[in-house]
């Protein structure tokens, strides 16, 4: 009997020990996951990743004699940082590397006029939309009526930004194989000027700025690409720790929309882009 009692005692001790270890491990996991909003507050900064070649959303400008990343998306990000009570730090990189930066914990959020399409929502969390825009085509002057339908895009060499919604539209929706995908809009504009591509599919606001900055180009007279809307939402690393941060971001977005600040930020960005 004493032997049985001893074995039972050892079994109970082992069970308690394993239970405590499991609780300890679970607590550690929860601590590692933590709350993203609190982590940002503790760090004192909100790190934004963007691709600053997409004026008026994000671009380089001389501000007080210093090269600075500015634009519509940056204004939205600043409003979010202000609400949290931290400084905004901006990282500039290629558009197709933005979600990778989130997953590698190099950035807290991405604002880059990024549409939360079906593929992206598998790999990132998103806020509510803060802006929506139509797509247009940029062509060489004198060719404004050359492209009349989406089908016409399949018969020409089209330029799109790599990793963009427009690339998905051209490749997946139209099934086009005759296209050029580059990481930066200015590079696409030069390709168009030099005759290496026939058109660029991009957002209406981006097109309006770029046709002013480059010679011999214009916006096409058609509704090509209008079924592929461009919209902006804040992207975050896919995680269970984002709930409070997403809630705060959505609160900021609604407040900016209700107060007319979203349109104000866009007009300010367009004006600043025109001055560069």
PLM feature spans:
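Periplasmic-binding protein-like
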Residues: 132-139, 208, 212-251, 270-276
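Extracytoplasmic small-molecule ligand-binding "clamshell" domains
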Residues: 29-113
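C-terminal motif of bacterial Sec signal peptides marking the signal peptidase cleavage site
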Residues: 18-22
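Short helices/loops that flank or line small-molecule/ion binding pockets
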Residues: 79-83, 91-92, 96-109, 123-125, ...
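Flexible hinge/capping segments at coil-to-helix
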Residues: 39, 140-157
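Extended ligand-binding regions for polar small-molecule ligands
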Residues: 24, 74-83, 164, 231-273
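Short loop->beta-strand "edge-of-pocket" segments that line small-molecule binding or catalytic clefts
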Residues: 44-50, 150-163
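A ligand-binding cleft/hinge motif common to bilobed small-molecule-binding domains
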Residues: 97, 114-122, 169-172, 193-194, ...
